[in-house]
């Protein structure tokens, strides 16, 4: 597996396990997204990572702020999207290994 993809997966798993909070996750994800020494990420995996990136833009843990904008999502929805991303990345890894 590509080392850059593994870093993204490990970061997502840390967040889901509660090892880091959403603010730490957002900061680390952004830093990793713009890492200069990143390996080339295949298009299918990048689409998944980019989708998580998009969810970071609409994730708002504060209920009062979320009420002002209908497009904002809560932590439960965000975690669900992270779980889907990990599952889809694993699926792609397994498909690649079968060829």
Q: Can you name each region flagged by the protein language model?
A:
Residues 1-99:
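Acidic, Ser/Pro/Thr-rich low-complexity regulatory regions
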